[in-house]
């Protein structure tokens, strides 16, 4: 149980984790207990492979655009299929994190060898998945008692969601033109190490447009430090990015960089509800970090394909 609506990010590790409000969280802290109605589980079967400059964020936005924000009806989603098995852990975190935008109580991915390796590299004395057979971590037969969704990643292209809902998502090339005053790469869903690398791949040897502010808030200090060691942070700063502290910050409308009434922002965050990132008059588009970086270069909504290294 977590005190944030994006607590389901931990589903990437096979944990059934969901967010609750302050009152319920206080009760959990006091008693160590909470109540939960066992939900149905809907299967999201991901086939194929992600193409150039297309990421887990594009998968979620495509699902939001196709099925809306009540796709899961506050029940559980399990992401599965060969595309999920091939995904690195940070991409899996993005899928489970934004299951909330699909109306899910929790998003889950069954643990596998990649999960075990990730956990062993970070907490070898506390977490051992090999204490149990692989079948222990797999979904039970018949457990997907809800709806079945499928998405062919071979045909997926970079997505963007227009204001003021993730459900307004469509292929970038299907949207009307849009100009931006702010580009934001941040939040738990859009500024992990792989996200920073993707943005740097677009911004290397390029500069941001004079009409736009590029703001970057890495998802964690550990990811920021590793990105710095790899030269990623230097590429972002050389392109014109201002690096902000690792915090929720602008994603929740906090801090001195919150959006003004006349700002139009393209953001790698999870939500673009009216007023979420600042003034109610501001407008927020959602996209992958690579697409945000591409927009930072041109100042406009831009397909990132062909811009990477």
Model regions and ranges:
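Fe-S-dependent hydro-lyases/dehydratases of central metabolism
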Residues: 1-309
